Structure formats: C-alpha cells, structure tokens
A protein has these predicted regions:
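N-terminal alpha-helical interaction blocks
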Residues: 1-108
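Conserved interdomain linker/interface between the two RecA-like ATPase lobes of SF2 helicase motors
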Residues: 62, 194, 327-389
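Interdomain "pre-motor" coupling segment immediately N-terminal to P-loop NTPase/helicase cores
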Residues: 75-79, 92, 100-160
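N-terminal pre-P-loop "Q-motif" helix
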Residues: 169-192
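Conserved strand-helix element at the start of the C-terminal RecA-like helicase core
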Residues: 197-205, 215, 220-235, 360-394
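Conserved helicase ATPase core of P-loop NTP-dependent helicases/translocases
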Residues: 233, 246-260, 403-420
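Post-DEXD/H (motif II) to motif III coupling segment of the RecA-like Helicase ATP-binding lobe
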Residues: 276-350, 358
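Conserved helicase/translocase motor-coupling segment
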Residues: 377-420
Length: 420
C-alpha cells in the first residue's frame, strides 16, 4: 500500500485519475505526464508501478496491517496531497468499503456549499476555468487546505470497538452537578442539543463524566473540543487519571496521538477537519477565543457530527447565538463548594502604577495579604510588554524571595511553565 520515493509525477497521475473528466481526456493526460517523466530523465520505480496499475486498472485488497494503519485517520477529510504525504498508493483504497470519496464543494440549486466548514456564502467561493472545466473552491476554510468541486477528498471510516474494561470515575458530585449530569445524559439520548450554563468553578468537566462513560460503553464516537491547546492537555491528563482503562486520542497543534478508541480530545481547529464522524461533540469554553465569533470553526463543528446527532456546549458566559441554537439549557448558578462567585472590586490608581513606574500602596497591600496567607496569586495584564515590568516591580516592592514567573502566548517555555 505504500511507496518509498515521492515525485511530482505521482501526484499528477492521481490528480488526473480522480478528477471529474472523461476517460479519453484522462488517457491523453496520462500520456503527457509519462512523456514529461521520460524527459525529466530520473527513474522512479514507484511512479512506473503506479502508472502501470492505473493504465491496466489493477485492483488491490488491503490487509489487516493496512487497515490498522489507516484507522488512525478515521473521520478526517484527506486530500490527495495528505495521502501522498503518508506515502500511500491511493488507488489501493478504491475497492475498500470503509473508504469514501467525496467532493469538498458541492452544488445545490445553483448554489455552492462547502462540506467542511458549512460555508454557503457565494461571495466566499472562488472559481476559475481549467480548459473547459469550471473549478470552484471555498475561501473561508482555505487555511486548512483547499477543498473544491474537482479533486475528491477521502474519508476513512474503519470500525473501532471501545474497550469494556473501563473503570467508571468515582468523582463525588454536588447535588446540582448530579442533577445536571443526569439531565445531560437524558437529553443526549433524546437527541437534544444542550447548553450547560455554569459559573466558573461549578465543575463543568465532572458534569460530562457520566455522558462520556455511557457513550464509550455504548461504542459511540465522542469528541471533547476546546479552543485552547493548554486546556486540551489539561483535560487529557484529568480524563486519563479519572477514567482508568480508557484510551484517548489527543490532537492539538503540537501533538497528534491516535489510539484504538472512539474518544477524542482536541482543539476546535482540529475538529473542523472531521466530517460527519462523531455521534456526540462536547465543546468546552464555547465563549473563548479563537472559537467564539469564528463562523468557520463554529459551523465546522456542526459538519463533524453525524446527521441528527448531538452537540453539547459548556460555558460560563454563553452568547445569545449559542442559547438560541440549543434545545435545552441546564443552569448551575453556584460553584461546587456552594459559595457564590467573588464580585470584582474596582480601585482607581494613578496611571503610572499601571506601567509599574510608581509604587502602589493599594496593590502592594492586597498582594501581601494574599501571600501572607500562603495562597497563590495570578495577575493578568493587558499586553505582553507589561509582564517583565510587573515581575520586576513585585521583586522590588514585595519580595525577592518568593517565586515569580510570567507566561504569554508566544513564550517558548509556555508548556513547561504551565504543566511542568
């Protein structure tokens, strides 16, 4: 199923082989590609083998080891280029019932629609002509790779059976958490899209434990998606600890680890790459950047679901759009321990304090009180440049002996500082 030596002529062959043109035109293109290959003058045995297979119509059957390899890419929309990066002889996939070919841009009543991001805004499609063929591609999700009406995408859907020796979490829930957890399971069984609207500290993650366990035991495909990769890592650690025996797929910008399991934790940027694959998608921090307000990510999440299946949102501050979309809202107004949320208090200070050029008695007193109680303190600043200034200020006016550090989005040691 694999080749060793990639060359541009292999990709050209497959682009012609799978494009939507008549057979006579394809034969002419194959000949032109082969002539260019000969002129190039460098022998590539893989190209010649693939060329002969395509010309003669050879058919292959994938063995178990091939299927085991491909299973890692279940649900993803893969382009010809994606498969060639994996060094797969793509025509080997043609006769397999678990692999579908579909076009990323489809036409419905003279309007175009992108199956990946759900775009149906005609102004966000670009078209051009290649000889007599009109090619249309979606511009809204172009950053994730081009999808069009000419070259098909491939979707792998090989059955995965979840392990049954998973130990159910013994996490203790509050009464409100327990009620929310039960209602969420009921709503999911009844195909109701649900918003869990809970304040910060209410324990939203623990509320979905029962749903995750029930879904995994029923061999459902379930995904927990989060906008930020830091939270993906944190949730992976928590679920791995609390669900003993459960294998988990984890996907974010720095890591893609696939295992034989139907449970996934990933960023919302990874979720858009899946198409009609998941039975249940849970989106945490649905109000957070970069998911919130990005129509490509928001509608792409819907495309990842099997039709008529369930979407669950978790948020402390849901938008009107989210609230209007769901069938039911489960509210938890207090935190796990029963205390109300602290109410922010505003203090006016000289603007020089905000750039840490002048000592602030108010800020120093407040920080010192917290540190004297042996508590940890997290301070947010509006711009990255203020991080080092604040660190210098605290060491000068509070204490040089306490451990002070800062982290920001582009910090090369970000993961080590947060999780180390």
């Amino acid at each position: 199923m694999f080749f060793e030596d990639h060359c541009e002529f292999i990709e050209a062959l497959y682009c012609v082989y799978y494009c939507d043109i008549d057979d006579d035109k394809k034969l002419e293109c194959y000949k032109n590609i082969y002539d260019d290959y000969v002129k190039f003058g460098k022998i590539n045995k893989d190209f010649e083998e693939i060329y002969n297979d395509i010309i003669t119509g050879a058919v292959y059957t994938l063995d178990d080891s091939n299927l085991e390899f491909l299973k890692k890419y279940n649900g993803l929309l893969l382009s010809i280029s994606d498969l060639l990066r994996l060094k797969i002889k793509i025509h080997y996939l043609d006769s397999n019932p678990y692999i579908n070919k579909l076009f990323g841009v489809i036409s419905h009543k003279k309007n175009y629609c992108c199956i990946r991001c759900g775009n149906n805004n005609q102004n966000l499609f670009y078209s051009y002509k290649n000889e007599d063929v009109k090619i249309v591609y979606c511009m809204r999700c172009l950053e994730f790779g081009r999808v069009d009406n000419f070259a098909p995408m491939f979707q792998i859907n090989i059955p995965v059976i979840n392990k049954k020796n998973i130990i159910k979490p013994s996490t203790k829930l509050s009464d409100l958490q327990s009620e929310a957890s039960k209602q969420l399971v009921i709503n999911t069984r009844n195909n109701k899209n649900t918003l869990v609207w809970a304040v910060c500290g209410a324990g939203k993650t623990e509320i979905v434990y029962e749903l995750v366990y029930a879904s995994v035991m029923s061999n459902k495909r379930i995904c927990m998606a989060i906008p930020r990769k830091d939270v993906v890592k944190e949730l992976y650690t928590r679920f791995s600890k609390d669900f003993r025996g459960l294998d988990i797929n984890i996907l974010h910008g720095d890591e893609k680890s696939f295992v034989d399991s139907n449970f996934y934790i990933m960023t919302t940027h990874q979720l858009i790459k899946y198409y009609k694959y998941f039975d249940i998608v849970i989106i945490d921090e649905v109000d957070a950047f970069p998911y919130s307000g990005d129509e490509c990510l928001e509608e792409g999440a819907l495309s990842s679901l099997v039709e008529e299946d369930v979407l669950v949102f978790l948020s402390a501050t849901p938008s009107k759009k989210i609230k209007s979309y769901v069938d039911d809202i489960i509210k938890i107004p207090i935190r796990y321990h029963g205390y109300l949320l602290p109410v922010p208090r505003i203090r006016k200070v000289n603007k020089k304090v905000l750039i840490f050029e002048e000592k602030s008695e108010i800020m120093n007193k407040y920080i010192s009180e917290i540190l004297n109680k042996k508590r940890r303190l997290l301070v947010f600043v509006p711009v990255i440049a203020m991080c080092q200034s604040l660190k210098n200020y605290l060491e000068k006016y509070i204490s040089e002996s306490i451990k002070i550090d800062y982290v920001y989005s582009e910090d090369k040691d970000r993961s080590e500082k947060i999780f180390g």
